[in-house]
Amino acid sequence: MTNRGVVPFGEQSWEQEAEGVRALVRQVDGARWAIVEYAPGSGRPEFCEVGHEGYVISGEITYEFASGGTIVAKAGEGFVLPTDDLHRGFNHGSEPARLLVIDN
């Protein structure tokens, strides 16, 4: 980081994480911070074991839990995905979903 306390995502290149899912990733004090974008109709095929906290910048994201159930977070809402419940994300909407995600 060039400016103490600032996380400069603009200096990163997009990384393809899954079909229709890409991310700008930074490591900040040992934690993974990412701007994640899900194209309309995209999702992750595998369940994730890592816990996350996040905020929906635009669009809408649905998280499905291996234990059953789902949550839907819309633009302007935050979410918490615990490490003890496997989960995976989907964008069932017609516009891209853009999120700020911090791994915990």
PLM features per residue range, with description:
Residues V80, S94-N104:
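A short hydrophobic beta-strand segment most commonly corresponding to one strand
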Residues Q16, Q27, R44-E46, Y63:
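Short loop/turn motifs at secondary-structure junctions and domain boundaries
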Residues M1-V36:
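A short, N-terminal "cap"/entry segment at the start of jelly-roll beta-barrel domains
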Residues D29-E49, T83:
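Conserved short histidine dyad/triad with adjacent acidic residue
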Residues R88-H92:
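Short, exposed beta-strand-loop hairpins at the edges of beta-sheets
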Residues S67-D84:
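Short acidic-glycine-tyrosine-enriched beta hairpin
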Residues Y38, F47-Y63:
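Short, conserved beta-strand element in jelly-roll/cupin
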